[in-house]
């Protein structure tokens, strides 16, 4: 008898499809578009700072600032420097936030974009320093500030130094505000921990993308502490909008236009 030739299973490249975390459908990458929105349920996929820049600011208007700042690893935390180096190599980023200036339909602003691909955009000394310097620069140059937040919280490898960044950035936000300048925050998934407890919620206007997770501690931690069952979806942008913690939920495709209008209305710089 002749042996039947085994049928070879074709290999499908990993990057060809993406599974939607919300509806669980397998989506052809090209169908997600530049905005990375699920065509089935309209879930907003998490995107990198580079992808965010491509869909949000005018052409080549972004001018990066405050690069090359490095953590001194204050606790000599085991394998921390190795983790930083590996993440930098993988993402092409120096740190969890990209800072600079950019234009939104001709409206110039100081801009920061946090990237959850970099150690979950945890806030350490470098993130704190870059954002603080951005606010100080914006105050000197009379520029509004726009920040896209995303974070898992404070960076545990830097201990109390990471927590100190909450007060440090908040003080810079206050000085910028005292100068009569506009500050806009856009909360993206997830915005949690010390970032939520400080500058993410200090904007003059607070926008959020649909279904963004926003909170300080996790649901289980809160329920264990208060010994109560919390409402379904209480840490989602829609719940926070209903209770007055967020000013508006804006579709990713509408963000650039919305930001430009707000900057123009609040005396943005041209």
UniProtKB/Swiss-Prot annotation:
Residue stretches making up the CoA carboxyltransferase N-terminal domain: 16-270
Family matches, as PROSITE patterns: COA_CT_NTER (PS50980)
GO cellular component: acetyl-CoA carboxylase complex
Compartments, record wording: Cytoplasm
Alphabetical keyword list: ATP-binding, Cytoplasm, Fatty acid biosynthesis, Fatty acid metabolism, Lipid biosynthesis, Lipid metabolism, Metal-binding, Nucleotide-binding, Transferase, Zinc, Zinc-finger
Subunit comment: Acetyl-CoA carboxylase is a heterohexamer composed of biotin carboxyl carrier protein (AccB), biotin carboxylase (AccC) and two subunits each of ACCase subunit alpha (AccA) and ACCase subunit beta (AccD).
Chain's role: Component of the acetyl coenzyme A carboxylase (ACC) complex. Biotin carboxylase (BC) catalyzes the carboxylation of biotin on its carrier protein (BCCP) and then the CO(2) group is transferred by the transcarboxylase to acetyl-CoA to form malonyl-CoA.
Name of the protein: Acetyl-coenzyme A carboxylase carboxyl transferase subunit beta
Natural source organism: Streptococcus mutans serotype c (strain NN2025)
Gene: accD
């Amino acid at each position: 008898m002749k042996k039947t030739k085994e049928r070879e299973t074709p290999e499908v490249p990993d990057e060809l499809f993406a599974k939607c975390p919300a509806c669980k459908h397998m989506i052809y990458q090209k169908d997600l578009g530049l905005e990375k929105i699920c065509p089935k349920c309209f879930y907003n996929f998490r995107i990198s700072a580079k992808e965010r820049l491509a869909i949000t600011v005018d052409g080549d208007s972004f001018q990066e600032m405050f690069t090359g700042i490095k953590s001194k690893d204050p606790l000599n935390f085991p394998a921390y420097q190795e983790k930083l180096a590996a993440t930098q190599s993988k993402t092409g980023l120096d740190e969890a936030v990209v800072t600079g200036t950019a234009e939104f339909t001709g409206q110039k602003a100081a801009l920061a974009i946090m990237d959850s691909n970099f150690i979950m955009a945890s806030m350490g000394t470098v993130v704190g320093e870059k954002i603080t310097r951005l606010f100080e620069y914006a105050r000197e140059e009379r520029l509004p500030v726009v920040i896209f937040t995303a974070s898992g919280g404070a960076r545990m490898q830097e201990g109390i130094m990471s927590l100190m960044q909450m007060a440090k950035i908040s003080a810079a936000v206050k000085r910028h505000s005292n100068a009569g300048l506009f500050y806009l925050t856009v909360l993206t998934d997830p915005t949690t921990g010390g970032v939520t407890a400080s500058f993410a919620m200090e904007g003059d206007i607070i926008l959020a993308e649909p279904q963004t997770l926003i909170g300080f501690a996790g649901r289980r931690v809160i329920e264990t502490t208060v010994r109560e069952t919390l409402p379904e979806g209480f840490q989602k942008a829609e719940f926070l909008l209903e209770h007055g913690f967020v000013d508006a939920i804006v579709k990713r495709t509408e963000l650039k236009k919305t930001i430009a209008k707000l900057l123009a209305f609040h005396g943005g710089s041209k």
